[in-house]
From Swiss-Prot:
The system is composed of three essential subunits: KdpA, KdpB and KdpC. InterPro entries: KdpC. Signal peptide: none annotated. It comes from the Bacteria. It is a single-pass membrane protein. It comes from Escherichia coli O127:H6 (strain E2348/69 / EPEC). Keywords: ATP-binding, Cell inner membrane, Cell membrane, Ion transport, Membrane, Nucleotide-binding, Potassium, Potassium transport, Transmembrane, Transmembrane helix, Transport. Part of the high-affinity ATP-driven potassium transport (or Kdp) system, which catalyzes the hydrolysis of ATP coupled with the electrogenic transport of potassium into the cytoplasm. This subunit acts as a catalytic chaperone that increases the ATP-binding affinity of the ATP-hydrolyzing subunit KdpB by the formation of a transient KdpB/KdpC/ATP ternary complex. The gene is kdpC. This is Potassium-transporting ATPase KdpC subunit.
Amino acid sequence: MRGLRPALSTFLFLLLITGGVYPLLTTALGQWWFPWQANGSLIREGDTVRGSALIGQNFTGNGYFHGRPSATAEMPYNPQASGGSNLAVSNPELDKQIAARVAELRAANPDASTNVPVELVTASASGLDNNITPQAAAWQIPRVAKARNLSVEQLTQLIAKYSQQPLVKYIGQPVVNIVELNLALDKLDE
């Protein structure tokens, strides 16, 4: 019985620290130092939440830039079904999916160059990716320009404006946030 008291007091102490103090402290510091990120990086227009800068959305119209394919269950970009979505490179089903996506993209983008960017035909590991390269966005310019009656130059400038450089120059590549880019396109129409 004497050994039970130190074990129980250690358990209660660690429960208090790991179950109360640590979560409250990290939440408070996150809200203090990074309030936008700690609250989901939500993109707001007035009182309306239009999306998150961290999670892609299913933009399908010709007047929008399309992101990476999402293979999440039930619906594209379903955050509750996030998980590995790509098949193994050796799987013949992956070849069929990529061929179908390439054919679909070429049909939707007849004025684009013939080389479809790889990130437009392969799903991300989470199925929720919101970023593509500026080159993949530029590949879609003819379709978006035609659908929105905008010039190639206007869209090129918009892509450049919403391109984000990696934190370290030689690690990573520039990306464009598709959600922010498409919301900016909608603002051009207003």
